[in-house]
């Protein structure tokens, strides 16, 4: 196991902290490891079932770090040490899309990029959606909300229109959860 010898913070703002750790590897050699500390976040799959089929709501926004506009599920975090994950998910959903959910289902907690960052992301399914007024942050003033069919969404994944790893992972998790839920429902019907 890698052991931490020392740690020092090299940068901080209200969203991110960066530290450099001096480490000792299992073979006894020392080195450094850069770690990005971020507070927990949420990602929300806003799913709407209608007579015409199933639809998801997506966000299109400019992502500064990669220099372009990208499409993804609503996601983000709050700059607070302790906050309820579902409360944060409901807040992010309302803030970015204007949507309010009658039902929120917790699916899992994922590590976003544990090779460099310790941030966790709580994954929620939002159903029973009602449209309200979006309240984006200053950094999100260019958000565009899109409602697309599940088939169109999955096509966007395969065509690399959506490349956000968190959205791809959340959708894969949802698909597995949904299949397991269907299987459990079918098993209960057989009894």
For the regions a protein language model found, what residue spans apply to each?
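Nudix hydrolase/Nudix homology domain
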Residues: 2, 6, 69, 117, ...
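A short coil-to-beta-strand element that immediately follows conserved catalytic motifs
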Residues: 3-4, 100-107
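Acidic, metal-coordinating catalytic segment for phosphate/diphosphate chemistry
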Residues: 6-45, 51
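Acidic pyrophosphate-coordinating catalytic loop
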Residues: 9-13, 64, 110-122
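Short beta-strand micro-motifs in enzyme catalytic cores
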Residues: 17-21, 31, 55, 69, ...
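Short, well-ordered beta-strand micro-motif
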Residues: 20-22, 46-48, 125-127, 147-149
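Active-site-adjacent beta-strand/loop module that shapes the phosphate/pyrophosphate-binding cleft
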Residues: 22-27, 113-133
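Conserved Nudix-box catalytic region and its N-terminal flanking loop in Nudix hydrolases
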Residues: 33-39, 45, 52-91, 139
């Amino acid at each position: 196991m890698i052991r931490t010898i020392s740690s020092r913070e090299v940068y901080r703002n209200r969203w991110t902290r960066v530290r450099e750790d001096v480490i000792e590897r299992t073979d006894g050699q020392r080195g450094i490891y850069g770690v990005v500390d971020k507070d927990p976040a949420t990602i929300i799959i806003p799913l709407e079932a209608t007579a015409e089929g199933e639809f998801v709501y997506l966000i299109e926004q400019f992502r500064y770090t990669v220099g372009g506009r990208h499409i993804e599920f609503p996601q983000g975090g709050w700059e607070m040490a302790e906050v309820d994950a579902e409360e944060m998910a409901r807040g992010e959903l309302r803030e970015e899309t204007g949507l309010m959910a009658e039902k929120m289902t917790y699916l899992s907690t994922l590590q976003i990029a544990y090779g460099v960052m310790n941030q966790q992301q709580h994954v929620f399914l939002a159903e029973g959606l009602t449209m309200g007024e979006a309240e984006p942050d200053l950094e999100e003033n260019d958000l565009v909300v899109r409602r697309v069919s599940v088939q169109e969404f999955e096509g966007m994944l395969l065509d690399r229109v959506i490349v956000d790893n968190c959205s791809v992972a959340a959708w894969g998790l949802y698909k597995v959860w949904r299949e397991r839920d269907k299987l459990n429902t079918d098993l209960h019907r057989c009894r």
